[in-house]
Amino acid sequence: MREKYILRCTECKNENYIGKNDKKKEKIEVKKFCSNCNKHELHKQKK
């Protein structure tokens, strides 16, 4: 079963991206564009 996750910007704490993945113990960390900060920032998976 695939599980939804939300990526949150580490700078402004804005929730920008939603995705699905297999259930894993590791948290996802990706550098993506934040429309609120208007630049590329590190996004981490919300708890």
Curated annotation (Swiss-Prot):
Pfam families: Ribosomal_L33
Gene3D superfamilies, A to Z: Ribosomal protein L33
Origin organism lineage: Bacteria, Bacillati, Mycoplasmatota, Mollicutes, Entomoplasmatales
Keywords annotated in UniProt: Ribonucleoprotein, Ribosomal protein
Name listed for the protein in its UniProt record: Large ribosomal subunit protein bL33B
GO CC field: cytoplasm; ribonucleoprotein complex; ribosome
InterPro entries assigned: Ribosomal_bL33, Ribosomal_bL33_sf, Ribosomal_zn-bd
SUPFAM superfamilies given in the database record: Zn-binding ribosomal proteins
Family: Belongs to the bacterial ribosomal protein bL33 family.
Listed GO MF terms: structural constituent of ribosome
GO biological process terms on file: translation
Underlying gene: rpmG2
